[in-house]
Amino acid sequence: MNVSHPAVHPVGVPPALGGHAVPPRMRMRVRMEYLVFQGMPLPGTLGGLVLRLGQFCSALIAFSVMLSVRDFSVTAFCYLVAATVLQCLWSLAMAVIDVYALLVKRSLRNPLLVSIFVVGDGVTATLTFAAACASAGVIVLIGNDIAMCKDNPCANYEAAIIMAFLSWFMVSISFILTFWLLATL
């Protein structure tokens, strides 16, 4: 009966540097933390607060412009209003948390808390992007294909869509950086 026998090879321990052995995983973690935390707009920092306020303001402007239009009965426009309201609420709540963290000088680098930020940013980014794309498609249909911009306030719709895309862009930056932070925790 031919059976292979496993060979056991001892694993060598790397030599200690200066009397202290630093495992390779810890050396990598230190390098990743250095790459992540150097001035990036993360939760609980001034840059993160500015990014959240930018998200909030652009979503609020998009919402306000859509409310100024008398009739937005198209489903995509209703979806844009709902998505911008959700984006406003999420960004405002995250801005309040950032202000709290800055005032009491607390770190928001708890893995559970950061994972909630990642999921919330991902969901709101997806919803805002979908709403902005759907509304942009309707505007292309109204403006270019059936030429009904004389009867509709296309400029207002376009301004709201631009602000929704700007809000999506800022929340996407927030999502990517927070996801990167989660990977290093």
Curated annotation (Swiss-Prot):
PANTHER family: CASP-LIKE PROTEIN 5A1, CASP-LIKE PROTEIN 5B3. Pfam families: CASP_dom. The chain crosses the membrane at residues 46-66, 77-97, 122-142, 161-181. Residues 1-45, 98-121, 182-185 are cytoplasmic. InterPro entries: CASP_dom, CASPL-5. This is CASP-like protein 5A1. The lineage of its organism: Eukaryota, Viridiplantae, Streptophyta, Embryophyta, Tracheophyta. It is found in: Cell membrane. Its main location: membrane. It comes from Picea sitchensis (Sitka spruce). Disulfide bonds: none annotated. Keywords: Cell membrane, Membrane, Transmembrane, Transmembrane helix. Belongs to the Casparian strip membrane proteins (CASP) family. Residues 67-76, 143-160 are extracellular. GO terms for cellular component: plasma membrane. Homodimer and heterodimers. It is a multi-pass membrane protein.
